[in-house]
Amino acid sequence: MRRSLAPSQLARRKPEDRSSDDEDWQPGTVTPKKRKSSSETQVQECFLSPFRKPLTQLLNRPPCLDSSQHEAFIRSILSKPFKVPIPNYQGPLGSRALGLKRAGVRRALHDPLEEGALVLYEPPPLSAHDQLKLDKEKLPVHVVVDPILSKVLRPHQREGVKFLWECVTSRRIPGSHGCIMADEMGLGKTLQCITLMWTLLRQSPECKPEIEKAVVVSPSSLVKNWYNEVEKWLGGRIQPLAIDGGSKDEIDRKLEGFMNQRGARVPSPILIISYETFRLHVGVLKKGNVGLVICDEGHRLKNSENQTYQALDSLNTSRRVLISGTPIQNDLLEYFSLVHFVNSGILGTAHEFKKHFELPILKSRDAAASEADRQRGEERLRELIGIVNRCLIRRTSDILSKYLPVKIEQVVCCRLTPLQTELYKRFLRQAKPEEELREGKMSVSSLSSITSLKKLCNHPALIYDKCVAEEDGFEGTLGIFPPGYNSKAVEPQLSGKMLVLDYILAVTRSRSSDKVVLVSNYTQTLDLFEKLCRVRRYLYVRLDGTMSIKKRAKVVERFNSPSSPDFVFMLSSKAGGCGLNLIGANRLVMFDPDWNPANDEQAMARVWRDGQKKICYIYRLLSAGTIEEKIFQRQSHKKALSSCVVDEEQDVERHFSLGELKELFTLDEASLSDTHDRLHCRRCVNNRQVWPPPDGSDCTSDLAQWNHSTDKRGLQDEVLQAAWDASSTAITFVFHQRSHEEQRGLH
């Protein structure tokens, strides 16, 4: 018997197919082995008992995806590319990518041949021999402003960026790296400085960043504004660090982190900090080097002896940019402090500057100066301008005439009411403040007298408490007030300026959709504005020193919205005169003048700015014949001085001697305008303008070249015409001028 058929080999034999389960197993011959098909090999073999019928194979099973294919498909759905965990990040912070250093010719970061490219530096041309001789990896490259910025820069801004870059890279004055950006308000100084910072942080002729870090120091009210401007123009390409408040330890920790950043990939290369915070934490910032410092509202550094100046001067950086729309505010020595801060030594010491420049120039500008004094002063002025112009750039606001609607400025002289006149004369008789000024001294009591008279010009309600308390100068004046007078109620008819303001607001509200900004130096005057608005049912917004920085931004944004129902925006010039953009309004009233023309200029520039679409009207209210006109005349003195040194206007007329400016405590009841009287105007006969202003004169011209009106004829503002009709005795004289002729297509 064959071994394969033996009972011991039973388990190894495969059963044959049977017709039914009842059939007995019969041993048969073993079929020869055949090669298994591919389909059969895929079925896993298993042991089957010969006494059981094998399971039928499922040959019609539907096709299914392989598990590995399915997993790969799910992964492709869920997978996301790597994203840098920085908000709004859109590109590399540095100019170099990771990897090996590429050999070959250096290339500029941006194409200098692109249409509209702003090229700040162009390498000197090389001969073919020099190109072969020099190392290609050391050749200087073009410095080209990032196209995202150069495309939005206006022509004067492109010129300004190039000037700034040449100054801070020591190409204008060898060995000096500072400059003053003295453009007037509204010309885009912030954008120009952001462009400068971004360019220095990204590139240089050496194909690497010029600086690693930059610090922007500004008033606390502008810290957020700077942060927003950087975000606006650069998007997520850079992450600035803004600090204005917090605990000392927290601020120190942030500043230490900022100063410890190194290399080409600094995460936060721009620090924005307020003057106050900088002064308190300068010890941390002095520990390292900073590539560039920018000081906004730089006229704060006019005194080289104050702590802020000394703190900034101790910072380890030679590249210094000072932004100030009004570089001269009080005297030339303050101007010297600003120039000395950015470029130490180019004007000598303070003593040398005063002797060589300041005294001869001031002497020549006096109305009583001799011809020799004038000639010597002009020579020193030319010498000073020649030195300073290498590090100072200034463009006046007449450039804006291409981009902004017409601005009409009006200086409105208002007659005091009988109550104001009597209180004014009583105070001068009883306080006798002029006696303290005869020796040229300014005592505490004389300063107090100035404040009292300024408040009286605004409204008698502001000095009512002094009358009740019978303070110096106001003894026995309580009986002058009308019977039953209530200081808590607003009575516009008791103040000449308040009466005119009431008419201006009423006419504007009834005849147009214009909004109005009211500006005053005193919060007490703002209180009167509030009372007047409540009585007249005007919706209003108020911004003063008590409002937080965060809330200011929201209030301004709401007021500027076309859908906002607010009609009046009340502004304290001390708290919010700088940096605010109030283009939602196109009429602004300066209710009282400041000694410093820069403060008034800043406040008046809130509405005539980029984005304004309407004709702007500026009203400067002055009480005729009073201390307010003397203050206004002093402003003209400072502005003429600034114009001579900064604007290079040689033909600015000097109408006021220094002796005349000391006549503060006088009252000329009969004068329609003390300022006009002192001009000795040749274009007016019997207080009526006979000859028009010279061609080309505008708002920046001397006051003698404005229009002079003693009635409503000739006024360019319908609202003021209507107000003059309504208050024929309240308005005595108006100076008015327009910024430029209206251009076609600009409304």
Swiss-Prot record:
GO molecular function, one term: helicase activity
Domain (Helicase C-terminal) ranges: 500-653
Group of enzyme by EC: hydrolase
Cellular location(s): Nucleus
Subunit text: Homohexamer. Interacts (via N-terminus) with RAD51. Interacts with NAP1L1. Interacts with BRD9; this interaction orchestrates RAD51-RAD54 complex formation.
Changes after translation: Acetylated. Acetylation promotes interaction with BRD9, and subsequently with RAD54, which is essential for homologous recombination (HR).
Enzyme nomenclature, EC number: 3.6.4.12
GO biological process: chromosome organization; determination of adult lifespan; DNA damage response; double-strand break repair; double-strand break repair via homologous recombination; response to ionizing radiation; response to xenobiotic stimulus
Species whose genome carries this gene: Mus musculus
Modified residues (Phosphoserine): S38, S572
Binding site for ATP: D183, E184, M185, G186, L187, G188, K189, T190
Keyword Phosphoprotein listed: yes
Similarity annotation: Belongs to the SNF2/RAD54 helicase family.
Known function: Plays an essential role in homologous recombination (HR) which is a major pathway for repairing DNA double-strand breaks (DSBs), single-stranded DNA (ssDNA) gaps, and stalled or collapsed replication forks. Acts as a molecular motor during the homology search and guides RAD51 ssDNA along a donor dsDNA thereby changing the homology search from the diffusion-based mechanism to a motor-guided mechanism. Plays also an essential role in RAD51-mediated synaptic complex formation which consists of three strands encased in a protein filament formed once homology is recognized.
Domain Helicase ATP-binding, first and last residues per copy: 170-345
Region of interest (Disordered), ranges: 1-42
Tissue specificity of this protein: Hardly detectable in most tissues. Dramatically increased in thymus, spleen and testis.
Name of the molecule in the record: DNA repair and recombination protein RAD54-like
SMART domains: DEXDc, HELICc
Protein encoded by which gene: Rad54l
Keywords carried by this UniProt record: Acetylation, ATP-binding, DNA damage, DNA repair, DNA-binding, Helicase, Hydrolase, Metal-binding, Nucleotide-binding, Nucleus, Phosphoprotein, Zinc
